[in-house]
Amino acid sequence: MAFFTANSYSQMFEVGAFAGGANFIGDVGKTNYILPNTPVGGLIAKWNRSPRHALRLSLLYAEISADDEKSNDTRRQQRGYSFDNTIAEASLGLEFNFFEFDLSEPQPQSTPYLYTGITYFRADHLWLKNGRANNLVNEGTNWDFAIPMVMGYKEAITESIIGAIEIGARYTFSDNLDGSWPEELLDRREPTAEFGNRNTNDWYVFTGISFTFTFGRKPCYSF
């Protein structure tokens, strides 16, 4: 009579693509938390360490823009600032599954999940180079960190394809993605070019879908 058990979890990998929309939350434009108005896309890789968690790496590129004239805030409408910026980010962290999601098991499988870690990004600095009466100017490069806070839902579409939808906010350590705090660019205070709320940093949000392909080691069995 033979007995057998699985003595290790299938440490399977995933690679794929993410696409969706981005929006900015700061001192220029609308203040909606989730309102995608520009594109974002890139690559995602995961190393599933157990049915409940995975190491995750993503490389994403996005455009962000904001326009005071589209804001519901009368003061911003009267001010009339606007900008366009780009963000290239690398993010590394842990993805936690609410329910067990074992890629070695048969379908159907699905679970909500959370992701967080550390993000390093590149964007343009902006500032009111020609004074408050003029618009924001892109000048210089802003390298900084952010904390990603992501909620999503994923499902095994086939034995080797995983589909997911997610919303992820990035709290940045910068207050100058919108040009409101040019000290980060100039290394000096410039009161005539400062505006907005100094007590809050900038955020950006990615909303989209991903499709990943799985591969890797199946469970080992003892007889």
Q: Which residues does each PLM region occupy?
A:
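Short glycine/proline- and aromatic-enriched beta-strand/turn motifs that initiate or cap beta-hairpins
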Residues: S8-N48, H125, F206-P219
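Residues that define the transmembrane beta-barrel architecture of outer-membrane proteins
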Residues: Q11, L35-P39, T86-A90, S110, ...
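Repeated loop/turn-to-beta-strand initiation elements of outer-membrane beta-barrel proteins
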Residues: F13, R52-L55, D102, E159-G163, ...
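Residues on the lipid-exposed face of transmembrane beta-strands in outer-membrane beta-barrel proteins
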Residues: A17, L43-W47, L92-F96, T116-Y120, ...
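Extracellular loop and loop/strand-boundary signature of outer-membrane beta-barrel proteins
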Residues: I25-T31, R75-F83, A133-E139, E194-N197
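Flexible, surface-exposed loop regions and adjacent strand-edge segments
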Residues: N32-P36, S71-Q78, N130-N135, S180-R189
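Gram-negative (and chloroplast) outer-membrane scaffold detector with strong preference
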Residues: H53-N130, F213-F215
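Predominantly the C-terminal beta-signal and adjacent terminal strand-loop region
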Residues: E69, I157-F223
